[in-house]
Amino acid sequence: MADEKNKPENPDLDQRDINNPRDREALKQAADNFLKARRAEARAEAAADEAEGEVDETANRIAVLEADNTELKDQMLRVAAEMENLRKRTQRDVQDARAYAITNFARDMLSVSDNLRRALDAIPADALEADSNLKSLSEGVEMTERAMLLALERHGVKKLEPEGQKFDPNFHQAMFEVPNPDLPNNTVVQVVQAGYAIGDRVLRPAMVGVSKGGPKVSAENGASTSEDNA
């Protein structure tokens, strides 16, 4: 098969006489044409092999680039998620800074308010009735106390009103217990010192007295149950 492929395909050449100059020239021309054709075929085969190799190389490069692209997308999504979390965290920190910036100052002002209230409570009622100047002074101190608390309220400080509510250790500090069979256990029955909150945080817990001996509160639905059924 290889010999047939490498042999010129013109049957007339077999009839040529190599000793005849014309035939010899024809044979030479045929051989040249055959060699040119074989060279062209060889170049075409080499080009085809090279092209096939380039296709394989291109396919490999595409696969590598697709893998790199997938990895870059994952990295981009992670970075975007981290940036979003950072933005939310920063926004929350800024909001907290604005809401709670006066926390320490407000706590100090509550001590001043407590002193004003103690001064007012220390004045006997009959002394106020007997001395108009003392009464005017007392009213002035009371107005100062109210103005201070209103100013704090404008900045997010609110007074807790726990009396009659269920004791909450996050906002209340129990100082004593009061026996009362008519109220559910751990109901705030008396406020010894007012408590305050700033935003959602406790600024100062309310010092309270709580009831004991009454029906317990069910943890499931908040309904009261008697001591005997507990």
From Swiss-Prot:
Q: What name goes with this protein?
A: Protein GrpE
Role: Participates actively in the response to hyperosmotic and heat shock by preventing the aggregation of stress-denatured proteins, in association with DnaK and GrpE. It is the nucleotide exchange factor for DnaK and may function as a thermosensor. Unfolded proteins bind initially to DnaJ; upon interaction with the DnaJ-bound protein, DnaK hydrolyzes its bound ATP, resulting in the formation of a stable complex. GrpE releases ADP from DnaK; ATP binding to DnaK triggers the release of the substrate protein, thus completing the reaction cycle.
Q: Where in the cell is it found?
A: Cytoplasm
State the organism named in the record.
Answer: Brucella suis (strain ATCC 23445 / NCTC 10510)
Q: Where is the signal peptide?
A: none
Which InterPro entries does the entry link to? GrpE (IPR000740), GrpE_coiled_coil (IPR013805), GrpE_head (IPR009012)
Where is the sequence biased in composition, kind Polar residues?
221-230
According to the UniProt record, one GO cellular component term is:
cytoplasm
Pfam entry (one): GrpE
Q: Which BP terms in the Gene Ontology apply to this protein? A: protein folding
Query: Chief subcellular site?
Result: cytoplasm
* Key words, A-Z: Chaperone, Cytoplasm, Stress response
Per the record, the similarity remark reads: Belongs to the GrpE family.
